């Protein structure tokens, strides 16, 4: 049985950036595990720990020694290893010397590409304790730290100054230098509750020692659970429920080693402000959890977390109440000031903001979007004037004080201000919903005008940025065009909107006045859209070949595309599917090889099998036409599946490329007719068996 032991590494430092703590913790674990894999060291399980002042990794049952192994070095080919006289060539002798061996110690390796000289050397495995320091140093140097810093007189660099390091393998310290500090077994507890050194007897004592002696909850996830539970209990104590968002929960966990809840209060007059304003003020500025009532409205309370068990918690409460008061007062001031000017009165001020140098100002974008919105509304038989009005106002809340202070409230404040201005309810709702979906899986607009405006705004942005030559590459997508494109597709598909996305693109491109190659831009955008559609389909559980089968017939209405791919997925489950897919592939290959144009009409046929196929194909053609008109592609494919036996009989009994030209043309025309019936839905020859 291979000897093993537990490994603990902890790096203690000044408070780490809270928004990157979890990412740093996971990256350190991943890097160390990658180093162990590279060193051929096995282990049982591994866990990462992270608090504001430490990153740690605990690995169970880590192999104590590398296994001995045979290292094989390959040298020159045998044909180059000997001279004309049969003596070893310089290449062979040089290879032997580089291995520290004689020519006689070399062996031969036969492969399908030839025979080679090789040298096999037994390498004794190293002790894990000797390998760990370099693995850790490399892991730390590869952490995703945007800006590293130096401290004292050290050359070491890290996200924050390092104060201690624990490195234990079993109960033994691996003595080394990590980022300018000597490793040992002494950790440190809470900065105020337990600032003294904490002796870690063994790796598995780490978590309990910090908890019991150090007032530190080392496990990030456990701190999140504790914070969530404590916030919920504290909210219940004042008759409410904690409003907890995951991002803030993570950030608060990254700010506290020993989180203690504190309930604070604010003046109920502030509840007259939009709820989102209060929530943003408390969350963004103060890292507070708001408290809601059972109807979903806010209560005049908040929950904050102190990183200390205070002997005077009332002072912490009052201090936080004093701090949040001016923040809420500022929000109240912005709300009152902004309402002195309507959104409509702010439209002209959009001319002061450049959207993109080739695409003009936000006012010019607004005018383009309004035209697109009117076009879309007309096609959907929606209220054109409401769509134009919603588009006209869509970006005006960017000119308000509130959105200037809280950018994440764009659209939300537009809705509130539009309602306050007396705008139509659908226009007001569209101010917020045209930004939907905001993230992957997020809700699409619920209102028709919001759907129209969302499409118009995103299409204009997509077409415009591509026309300016700013095409996303790799992970660079400054205008979030991937998200915008997926948003277009989701709005169309998930709301049952049967618009042609290429027609919308053409309408958008026609509005730009700057010089660009329209045809080239159009094709690039179309490719980009369908690349996003492929990703969407794969996420929905469709396969790549099902997507390619539908893409081959070039449907440009995403909703129609989804109806087709759903039908193809169902079709391929039929017992006839594999045979028909193979037959279609054969038909397409036959038609491609034809040296002459294939006649549109089918002439005389002589064999019973081909006459039967013609009759069956004519019958199916008649029956699927109304199904295609209804976009009932599933029933249409089910009907075409009934052709299997007739198609198989044709290929079993008929030679297509007969010497009789007229007969050959008739048979080719018959196959073209059959192929075209399937191609009205999808190219099922793309389906893999």
Where do the model's predicted regions map?
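Amphipathic alpha-helical "coupling" segments that flank catalytic cores
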Residues: 1-689
